[in-house]
Every structure is written in C-alpha cells, then in structure tokens.
Amino acid sequence: MTRKILVTSALPYANGSIHLGHMVEHIQTDVWVRFQKLRGNECHYCCADDTHGTPVMLAAQKQGIAPEDMIAKVREEHLADFTGFFIGYDNYYSTHSPENKQFSQDIYRALKANGKIESRVIEQLFDPEKQMFLPDRFVKGECPKCHAQDQYGDNCEVCGTTYSPTELINPYSAVSGAKPELRESEHFFFKLGECADFLKAWTSGNNPHDGKPHLQAEALNKMKEWLGEGEETTLSDWDISRDAPYFGFEIPDAPGKYFYVWLDAPVGYMASFKNLCDRIGVDFDEYFKADSQTEMYHFIGKDILYFHALFWPAMLHFSGHRAPTGVYAHGFLTVDGQKMSKSRGTFITAKSYLEQGLNPEWMRYYIAAKLNSKIEDIDLNLQDFISRVNSDLVGKYVNIAARASGFIAKRFEGRLKDVADSELLAKLTAQSEAIAECYESREYARALRDIMALADIVNEYVDANKPWELAKQEGQDARLHEVCSELINAFTMLTAYLAPVLPQTAANAAKFLNLEAITWANTRETLGKHAINKYEHLMQRVEQKQVDDLIEANKQSIQTTPAPAAEESQYEKVAEQASFDDFMKIDMRVAKVLNCEAVEGSTKLLKFDLDFGFEKRIIFSGIAASYPNPAELNGRMVIAVANFAPRKMAKFGVSEGMILSAATADGKLKLLDVDAGAQPGDKVG
C-alpha cells in the first residue's frame, strides 16, 4: 500500500549563511525522502526560511532596506546553497507568507477558545529612543564585577560573570545608545502546563504506521525530565508574544503585540505544505486533520527538541490538528574533532564549498556514512573525508562500470547478456530489504557499510575473472560477455542502493544504463538483453589541494569581511594561566536541582534550590534567556562551585555559590551535564 508522507527539515533562520552544520540535517532528511520516493511512496518534502524576529528587523535596518527585501534575498541564497547540494525540496517557502499568517492566527484563536491562552503583565528593559523592548543581548554597560566596559546584558566577556541587565553599571541600549528604562508590558502565554497529560501520552507513545516510538530513546528520556513524574508536571507556560516594533505577525485583537518567532516558525511547515498543495492539487486537510491517517515527520537538531516534542505537538493537538508521527533529532557537526571555527577555516559555508568546485555528493556520502538513528554528534575528519570518498565511491563503486562498459560497447554492440541466474547478482538482490530497513530507520551508516561490502564482493569477482585477460583469449567471448554483463547489472544494483545518497550520480548512471530512472526495483531485477549507452566518467577523486584551498578560502573570508571583533572567533580568549594551587582552591560539587523558577522582577535570573548532599542551598544564575521554562531543570544534576563567597543579588536575595555553564557561540548559556551515577555532593575535579 502506498504511504502518504509529509517530511520537513527545521527552518534555517534568515539572518546568516548556510554552513555544513545545516547540511547535516538537510542531507539526512533528503536521503530519507529520496528513499521513500524510490520505494514508490507519496512523499512531500517541505521547508522554508524562518524570517521573523528582532535580529532580522535590526539586520535589515542596518542594511537600510525593508525586512521583506532582506529575507527575499536571503531565501534566494539559502535555496541556491541547498539546491547545489541536491536537496530535493518539493517546496521551499517563507514563514513571512499569507498562508503562515492565516494558520498562526487560526491556531492562536483555537487555543484561546480552548482556554489555553492567558495574558500577564511582565517587566522588561525598554529603549525610550527607539521605543522598543530590549532583549538582554541588546543591552550593554559596565560589568558590575570587573568593571569592563561595553559588556552585554547577560554576561561579561572579560571576567565571565553572569548577571541581570539591571545590574549593569551605566547601561545603554546597543540599538540606540539610550539609557534603558524598566517598564511593564502585557504578554500572552500558552498554558503549556495544562497540556501535560496529553504530552506524557504522546511523547511515550508509538505511531500507528509501524508501531515505532514518536521519539528516539534519548529524546524520550529528556521529555520525562521536562514533564515530571506521575501526575506532577514541571512544564512552565510559554510566552508567545513580543512587543512592537517587531518583524512578524500581529496577534489578533491585540494591537502592538506580535507572535514570538517560535510560535509561527513551526506553523511554517503547514504554510509551506499548503502552498505546495494549492499548486499540485493535494488535499491539505487529509494531512492535518485530527484523525489523519497520513504520516508527518520532522527532522531537527537536538537543540530544538523542546519546541518540536512539546510545544509543537501541544499546539497542534489543542487547536484541532494531528500531532507528528515522529520527531527525529540529530547531533551537531564537529570538524577534525573540534567545534567549527572561523579562525581555523573549518566554519565552512555551503557556498564556499560549491564555489571551490568540490563535488557536493562527496559531502553527502561522507555525512550519510556517519549518520545513524541516535542523537549523536558527528565529526567531519578532513583526511578521512578524502580517503573514504576516494576508496568507496571512486575505487569500489564507479570503477565497476568503468572496467566493464568498454568491452560491452566494443565487443557486443552495447548490448548486455541475460544473466538472471547469476550467483553474484543473487548476493546483491538478497540484501534489498535489509538495506531498505536501514534507510527507513535512518541507520545510514550501516546501510552504506553493507552497500560497500557488496561492492567489495563485486570487485573480488572482477579480480577473480579478469575481463581484460578474457578479452585477449580466443574462444572466451561468451564468458567475457557474461562477466561484463554481470558487472553492469551489479553496478546498476549498487547505484539503486546508493541513489538516496548520490542522486546526481544515479541520474547520470541512468543515462549511461539507458534507463528512464533508477528505482528501488533495480535492486531486485536484472536488465536482461538490454542496450546501454557509452560510458561517461561519473566521479573524480578528491585531491588534498581542494580541501586545503577550501580551508584557506574560509579563513580568507574572515580577513576580508568586516565584522565585530566578537565575530572573529567563536571562542573567547583563554584567561591568564592559573597555578595548580589556584585551581585546588575551587571546590566544585555535583548538586541536584530541587526546584528552579524565574525571579520576579528579573528577566535574567533563575533561582535554584539545590541539594548538595551535605546541605541545601539557594543559588541565583543568570541563564533565564537560555532556559525560558525553568521548571524543566527540576531533578537535573548540575555542577556548582561550593566554596564561592555568598553574593547579594540586588533585591532578590543571597546566592550561595555559582552554577557552571558553557557560553555558546551565539551567546546562549548551557548547563554542564553530569554523567549518570554521580550523586549530590560528589566532588568534581
């Protein structure tokens, strides 16, 4: 039975270039979609640019153009990059679209009618000159601890202290330079806490299509942390509004209030699909009605699991729509074992890769060969990239056709012999369903290992039968014809197995093989007495110089592109050396979060009630921007400095320690994880 499937990748933000980190997800999705289409399923792949928010608005102002003009230009650039890597969207749209506006407003109205929307008054810093509320990173001033100038409103880049924007000395707006004021504003909240029963059932449930879980095991464990145990829930309500000026969609019946980007961004999946449906005549409602029998899968990065596994399913369900069939998260990309770095030239943009003339299918293959169904980071080792592509694709796969096609063309008028009874081909066809299951379950690394093992068998057959020697021997024409026909058939089967990963090579191979297209049926069927065309070379080797030039090109882009000093490297400068004795003065301990909550009157601080094993303490931490739902941290193990001198936090109370976190390249703060088995009070060092 033909399956009906909607598939999406997370929407790239319209305020930056596409890099290889983005490509991991879109290649993973594209491989899965192409596999489904090869199997004959009706599969629609939709994506879009995520276009709303303060960063887009300010970036457009800086360029002196309208946000609409900027996002249109960025969308063209993004689509060109993805197309260059053969990402085969059925529709690549924009969240700034009439369909998205309508769906966002309709969903909001439905949630409100179901009692899931509530208005509350909150306090925020306000720029009186620009007449806008300021996110923490748009407030600067003097660090209250080390007195460094021009520090951001959430942490000091000189001494590393975290704080609230209200603690800055002589704060000013990074947008206008004006002194900000603390003002009240009415905001709208999605009552996510009331959705806990549904979310507990959905996150732990299985999809009706094949009985597999909606979420990966690692994701489900994280959901259990966020959702709490039993009838209790740790979910906090979600602020879904922002104040004007803001580039986005205005909330119905709330002048000057706009949907927060994370409300209308996932709705962009619906909008992109609706736009496609209207063009090709597909029934949109069949896919999104509450009792839909179709399948819907979201491929995302692990950093946005909260939105896709909790917020989005709840939005859909309580607005009268279906929830996703599956949400599949992947890890991050490192290069040569380290985070991508502009200074080292390993923050590689898709555009630079294409402009340097590297074959995009090399990268598609390498990334796919590293991907599995788990939420694991993958590493692009550049030397391994060269050797694996050259060995697998050129040495094992492409050479099979090159070694047999010439004899078929010259000696047998380009026509194959019927080799349906070949033992060699039987070994290849026997793996069809096993490899299909690997693709279906996103075990691409295993699929490609198995495919290359089959290629090894074929190459062993080449070496054992030596067609170049048969061609020189009298009376061996029939055997030569048989061997070369087996090899061309084997090449066809391998091409079908690799087609989801190498779509352009498969298309070029189809021309050589005189086939309309490669399908999954080619993994099980021989070609018979089929005429083929002249062989054209299908793939070149990767040269070391090409990779070296790529790295240099990305280093050069930093030197020639004006940017703030903070953008020169994604890593902060290493502090002065500390002696061993200095380090030993710091007493770091594991602590369990008993309760975490927002601090009334602060947009920056979270209050942690911690169990250190030997005693309980309260610590304030300036990480509210990174954890908008603080209750999700309840029950988590953290690392804290236990002998840090108590510090009075303005009017909020005394902080009895410091919780350790990592500052990411985009300014977010992430708590450090503790391995399973560690207990409160355990010493870290």
UniProtKB/Swiss-Prot annotation:
Q: Which GO terms describe its molecular function?
A: ATP binding; metal ion binding; methionine-tRNA ligase activity; tRNA binding
- For this protein, what reaction is catalysed? tRNA(Met) + L-methionine + ATP = L-methionyl-tRNA(Met) + AMP + diphosphate
Q: What residues does the tRNA-binding domain cover?
A: 582-685
Q: Which GO terms describe its cellular component?
A: cytosol
Matches recorded under InterPro entries: aa-tRNA-synth_I_CS, Anticodon_Met, Met-tRNA-synth_bsu_C, Met-tRNA_ligase_1, Met-tRNA_synth, Methionyl/Leucyl_tRNA_Synth, MetRS_core, MetRS_Zn
Write down the SUPFAM superfamilies for this protein, in alphabetical order: Anticodon-binding domain of a subclass of class I aminoacyl-tRNA synthetases (SSF47323), Methionyl-tRNA synthetase (MetRS), Zn-domain (SSF57770), Nucleic acid-binding proteins (SSF50249), Nucleotidylyl transferase (SSF52374)
Q: Which UniProt keywords apply?
A: Aminoacyl-tRNA synthetase, ATP-binding, Cytoplasm, Ligase, Metal-binding, Nucleotide-binding, Protein biosynthesis, RNA-binding, tRNA-binding, Zinc
'HIGH' region: where is this motif? 12-22
Q: How is the cofactor bound?
A: Binds 1 zinc ion per subunit.
Q: What is its main location?
A: cytoplasm
Q: Which cofactor does it need?
A: Zn(2+)
The UniProt family comment states: Belongs to the class-I aminoacyl-tRNA synthetase family. MetG type 1 subfamily.
Free-text function comment from the UniProt entry: Is required not only for elongation of protein synthesis but also for the initiation of all mRNA translation through initiator tRNA(fMet) aminoacylation.
Complex formation: Homodimer.
Q: Specify the protein name.
A: Methionine--tRNA ligase
Starting at the broadest rank, the lineage of the source organism is: Bacteria, Pseudomonadati, Pseudomonadota, Betaproteobacteria, Neisseriales
